[in-house]
Amino acid sequence: MKKQKRILFDKKNKFHFYYIWSVKNPKVWVHIIHGMSEHAVRYDELASELNKEDILVTADDHRGHGETGRSMKSLFHFSDSDGWSKIIKDQIDLISEQNIRCPLIILGHSLGSYMAMNVLQQIEKLKTNVKVSGLVLSGSGYESKWLYRINKLIAKIEIFRCGTRASSNILQKLSFESFNNNFSPTRTASDWLSRDENQVKKYVEDPLCGGAPSTKTWFDFMHGMNQIFNSRNLNLIDKKIPIHFISGDKDPVGKNGKGVVKFKNLLLDAGFKQVTLKLYPESRHELINDLDRDKVIADVKIWLRAILN
């Protein structure tokens, strides 16, 4: 079914855009949480494929992203204050607003994979009625708690030096600009995303993609990472929830597979019982936009059927 654009309003009557790809009698509900410097409409093909299996799909444009960011005149900037808390609350509010009565799976990509983990933690902390039946985490990874603390400090210094809403060359070099280093020759600064040149071209030409996040957004993200990997917060999550990692073994965000394995092992060591991982040879950061996307989507469908049966 064609996607429908919908709008939620916050207390200040600011627009929060989200999309729903509905089906008549949904067996499953997949809520997609997109990554940094992109937007929900990029998941249209994935949503349409899931619809074929009677899976209803929702996805929002986060604060600072897509139509939400454009309407707030704050592209690539979460908020002047408490940005991480706000984007997590937005997800919980959006999910809670829906009157959908079937098992809910959250599929988070990159930034969205970490948001998905924190959404689970906050659902438990706030004791909401939202029940999540599983997670699919795409384009994720883990480094170390001390590195996240250092990066948060660097972002704090850059806020002082450049301003809250400004971008930072230093933060860009430590993140997006470094991701292309393992690829040669390169056509664009975004070749690390996919081997599919047409998909990279679409991303580069999309005004709602690829912008440098603000210093405050980086600070908020690092604050979020420190929250997620806090052992007390990890223990809030039901250890029986199925969590499935998917990643390209040439994804720099996942350290070519090593960072994803590290994340998986961290969860297993924390007592999680159903953690699985699928690495795709030669694939890069955006699996659903890479050359193996048909295989990736088919595998996600198989995983969904398996856990729900």
Features from the language model and the residues they span:
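Active-site glycine-rich loops that stabilize anionic/oxyanionic intermediates
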Residues: 34-38, 110, 249-250
